[in-house]
């Protein structure tokens, strides 16, 4: 699944396998490679979806509740990966209800009573 997302970009099978293996390991999914989607948990499916989105190294990442289906521990790991990507000059825009993750943002907007307002940003 992740491999095909990479293969669609440059048609280099060896590179696609290498990149897919690397990102799958980073999301802790190495032991799930031979499983069908119906055999995976919601959190595992969410991590695969994120892996597919990230494998081609987009400059801009737009994510709506990227950790919504994940337990707190796995969610923290996903945000660590996203934070590392940010340091590689990638723009990451995400919506979240999780205050901890919202506070990790450099710039934050909040919706209060149906109105979008700027909020305190991290320095």
Give short role names for the model-derived ranges.
Residues 61-64:
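Catalytic Walker B motif of ABC-type/P-loop ATPase nucleotide-binding domains
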Residues 90-95:
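Conserved H-loop
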């Amino acid at each position: 699944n992740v491999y095909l997302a990479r293969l669609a970009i440059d048609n280099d099978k060896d590179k696609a396998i290498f990149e897919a293996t690397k990102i799958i390991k980073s999301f802790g999914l190495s032991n799930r490679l031979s499983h069908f989607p119906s055999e995976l948990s919601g959190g595992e499916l969410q991590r695969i979806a994120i892996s597919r989105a990230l494998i081609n190294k987009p400059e801009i990442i737009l994510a709506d509740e990227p950790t919504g289906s994940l337990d707190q521990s796995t969610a923290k790991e996903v945000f660590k990966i996203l934070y590392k990507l940010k340091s590689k000059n990638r723009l990451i825009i995400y919506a979240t209800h999780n205050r901890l993750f919202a506070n990790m943002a450099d710039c934050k907007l909040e919706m209060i009573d149906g109105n979008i307002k700027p909020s305190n940003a991290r320095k």
